[in-house]
Amino acid sequence: RHGLTAYNAEKRYQGQRDIPLCPAGRAQLRQADLWPETVYITPLCRTRQTAEVLFPGARLVEVKDLQEMCFGSFEGRNFIEMEHDPDYLAWVNANCESPCPDGETKAVFSERVCRAFAALVDRALADGEETLVILAHGGTQMAAMERYALPHADYYHWCAPNAGGYVLDAGDWAEQRVLHLLKTVQYTKEEAR
């Protein structure tokens, strides 16, 4: 997942707004302990900025369908600003499953992400790649992990902190379309100590 942005710090829905890392978010990142040739990112600058610090020198390839969910009219706002908004309250009361006004449903978003994610895993395995690195968004992680990760857990369980993620094993992917969780990772300077 990308590093901290001002919207993250203010608990605002970012969605597909192109919000950069905040100075504190950039300062807390540290270089990862692996050196992939290629890192898959989204067109949003916060993923590129994070990848440039974590994986310097890697070729960065944008995958549009890995972008965060489009939260429509909720983007740029936080809960406090919307606590009396009937559209927001209806969406929250529907477990965030209904469409966001001018945005996506969680189901449409998850399908988009999982299709793109699976295509990358399929291609990496077909090409004999040892490592596949994807640096995207919290929602992207949650959608892919809910669908493909073992042990199974619900969508919100998989919300990693900023600059956090998962290391997965694809040994059973070809036959079962599952990935086994090996460990979580956190690429901030505090976690390096």
Model-identified regions with their sequence ranges:
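Active-site-proximal alpha-helix that buttresses catalytic centers in soluble enzyme cores
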Residues: 1-58
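Short active-site segment of divalent metal-dependent hydrolases/proteases
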Residues: 5, 140-141
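Generic beta-sheet signal
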Residues: 37, 128-138
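Short beta-strand scaffold positions
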Residues: 41-42, 111, 135-136
